[in-house]
């Protein structure tokens, strides 16, 4: 009978809902929820353990303690259900109602709700327009507030102290009304006429001009309107009735020994009830005012502590001095309701164990210990045992399994067949951290994992553990097989490259197998095919590396899609011919006819996937692994101490370097160089020496001399084990070999600065004590950093997921013509990322034309696959416009065309794909990887020698962009402008190289000249920045007063003296406002003007600048007037990288940002004030000019009379993304953030597709600020969801009304997450109290659009397989249909129950 009831209950559908609204609860509403008033603070009777009547656990109010049984025991059993016992007043029903029935407490005096009082900005304060301090004084009974002034001179809401109140009473009697406590505030709130107030405020807003006042008024108007629209009443922010949480949510558990463990809430409620009852009694007794007042204050404090302990004053502590956990603490933070229970749940049917290698497994398999499988698949086994009639009841089946009878194992095999399990390794940083496999039963207790999936899991076998989960329902198994099977996850969603790539042993084996060797055994044989090659090798007639000729048959498809065979005799080696046997049909032989390193193998698998598709690739990957393992074992490659060959040149190189260092030291002592310069130069010398040693060592290791068949000596690539491991990419790198056999080099201190004495020894020679100490210095920092950065990186991922969680592909094409221009990323002489890699998998936004013609190469809306990219390269297309997520026009989502290819699948993305989460994981996952990988080079400083010249790599035409230059006395060009770019253009007009040329460089070639490859075109001193004059004349010192702004440094040895400008911090008071400068005058002492402007030539000198000229000396243009020493850089490491990425995504303004031109026009300088210059830009069309004050110490890039465009850099510095957005637009800011983030990851060799970063940028740009509201109901200056503005404007344009104008805003990811439309999502992220308070006051509706909200309310997410369900609901809602609820009769129910039982609890009978 009980089962039948449960079954009936399961048949009733849960109610469907479309949105969740949060609002203030009115006292009547609280009473309507309640099942009775809690009058006593007692909980349960400690002798009988029965709840006390009218107490906090009262059974009459909250429901029975035992199922279907009243408290006194008069009614028991199901037949009485719904009866209310006349003796104890308890309803006979299930005990789980104690989780949902609420009670209430009638408060004897109103109390303010602390959230609306103290959560900043205080809602009560904003509404009443009173300072929080005053409201608190009223609430806590320190002063009176005037409620009605009547005919007196007292203002409404005026605060009166006790004395003032008494005086007023004497003067006016009862003409006026003033109260204290929450009653007073309640009265004030009740008397407010919201609509009237709104009107007056709007009028005020139109009249006022002051910015601060406007801000305050808009805030108040918004709050008032929220109250009007939501139907909340302001006086509901003051509680008169307090709801009581259901008792099962604040349990009281008896421990042994007569003590109780209780939830803190019970204590807090007890305090409230006690104080409330005492207050009631005092009021009945008409006690003196002062006593009542004190009791009311205490009640207010008790209610505050219950709602949010510690928000005001000291937190109330329990018996053990620990603050009590209040209602607010229950929901916020990592341990709160949201993050602990709603977003993270525990999973049953799971197990965990250590993992070991399963080298014989297929890619879709994993080894599952029998013990574990038996436990996990128990329900299925029970079902099968009953179905087969081997056990009559579940109990019998249970016994059989416990005895582990032989039949049980057979049934386990059946149950497990084709039933995938999920394997997960923590931390799950991206979706590949959980994959599905088919279990293979094994002996032992460790889970076996396929080696190729280790890269995706970031797993190794040094004791890692993994968890196993069993998908129970048919749908879950289907999803696991179709979407999560390891064979379906060959490509990484972050960059679209294979992630199932052999590494380590396999790579070494394949590399060893495909190497060739001069004069090996069997060289010159001619073989009939791979089979014979294998026979010859097995018979010992030929070596694996012998160069032979083999007949090879290749296949390729013709136009009719049929395989065509092509046979030829190819020069190759035995090993490569053997490897060819496992290469799938359709790949060219050239793919294996080379020494295969890790990159080549990856490329081979990628090619295989693109040409042949999924299945052959999976089989091929497995085969490469088996072969690789086999031949790695055959090779017997191992590391011996003699494999580390130390180059002979090492001693000589080190001696030379030491001599150079001694020379610099000498110069330093003679005063020719400063301490900073000396340090930098020493570091450079050692860095260069280290490079030379490394080069010599690698030459030594990488080649060996052998005698070929003709008896002649020949050099070939060496078979040294260490070299082979590094060369193949199996393990180790040149940097590590350098430490083993070269020299360890420079090390970093914990603060990142480089220690100038390098470690000249290597690990083979061994380190002495000092060297060892220096080593540990940096290595420790590496480990400490790792721990910190893992946490940081995890937090970054969490913020990214939170900001992007609701972004899903919702339609096929939004039809926009917008997009972003893509060009190759060029840094220095290298194309860091060619165009094809940037546009692959994107959709063209405009027709792509053949360069120089009007012929269409590719039409608009073409998805660029590999073939199309080849076409672009053929026609040498240099830039093209592609669709981008940032410019997608879809409201609430993104369209498939703007996103392009699904990187993990290789076709255009499907609707319902959760691209936001994928993007967040793709960016966050390497963050952790990188942070974990800092210490691998043992803190060895990897700082390259400072650049001091530009040497071009390709021949072509030199092009200088924004360059100004002068010719110096030697006839060379000297650059005098700041952001100069130098580009090399090839004959097709494509940019091949691009360099930044620093200020003060000497150019060997000018703009437009032809340059040969390898030519040096520019030189500069990397350690100092010169100040260069553009005019000739005589020097005149201004404001250079000894001891105030400058100091003379005379060299003891050389007697040369130079002037050093003091930093403003080092100057005396008199020197603070002086501005040391060098002025250039002509022979008569008149100012010389800068050419092309009417500004006198004078050069302001920054602090620390060194001048080696005297007053009045003659100089000519292009000469150096002064040198500013550059600070030495620390080491480049992702440490700088991770905070940098976080700063970019948080859109933080840099400390001293670049100053950009606000409008286009001509520059001039206005009147100067103390410490600032006035920059004036006058537009050419003569409209209003723009002024800005710039601190004098800022170096300006512009001169008087120069023309600038809006958004040009006026003064150097890191650019602020907000300025870029404001002045250059959305695309510029997207490009900036994308490039800067990619820069950090590229340094670490991590590839991430640009799309992911653009997705995050789109989410950062989702708000806009209204400039003028037009006919919309937005307020000027209000921040609104961008899509809402777009929708509103579309409606207005359709009706021919005035639309709103707006400016896009860039929000940092934390801000953007908190500003989302969904309050549930925001509350579960951070600042829960604030978010909920705001939402409740505004009466917000959550439409449950994102993923997070849906997870929290416990239904399918609107993405992936849940997308269809939500689309269906939307359709039904639009059609106005009622949700279909199947009506079930009792007969049908019992029939289907019987059917269920016969089928063995839903076991599958097809096996």
Curated annotation (Swiss-Prot):
UniProt binding sites for Zn(2+) 2: 814, 888, 895, 898
Family according to the record: Belongs to the RNA polymerase beta' chain family.
Catalytic activity: RNA(n) + a ribonucleoside 5'-triphosphate = RNA(n+1) + diphosphate
One Pfam entry name: RNA_pol_Rpb1_5
Domain of life, source organism: Bacteria
Name of the protein: DNA-directed RNA polymerase subunit beta'
EC number, UniProt record: 2.7.7.6
Cofactor note (record): Binds 1 Mg(2+) ion per subunit.
InterPro entries noted in UniProt: DNA-dir_RpoC_beta_prime, DNA-dir_RpoC_beta_prime_bact, RNA_pol_asu, RNA_pol_N, RNA_pol_Rpb1_1, RNA_pol_Rpb1_3, RNA_pol_Rpb1_3_sf, RNA_pol_Rpb1_4
Cofactor annotation: Mg(2+); Zn(2+)
Biological process per Gene Ontology, one example term: DNA-templated transcription
Keyword Nucleotide-binding in record: no
Keywords: DNA-directed RNA polymerase, Magnesium, Metal-binding, Nucleotidyltransferase, Transcription, Transferase, Zinc
Residues annotated as binding Zn(2+) 1: 70, 72, 85, 88
Any one Gene Ontology molecular-function term assigned to this protein's record: DNA binding
Enzyme class: transferase
GO terms for cellular component: DNA-directed RNA polymerase complex
Role: DNA-dependent RNA polymerase catalyzes the transcription of DNA into RNA using the four ribonucleoside triphosphates as substrates.
Quaternary structure, from the entry: The RNAP catalytic core consists of 2 alpha, 1 beta, 1 beta' and 1 omega subunit. When a sigma factor is associated with the core the holoenzyme is formed, which can initiate transcription.
UniProt keyword Calcium, yes or no: no
Coiled coil residues, start to end: none
Binding, Mg(2+): 460, 462, 464
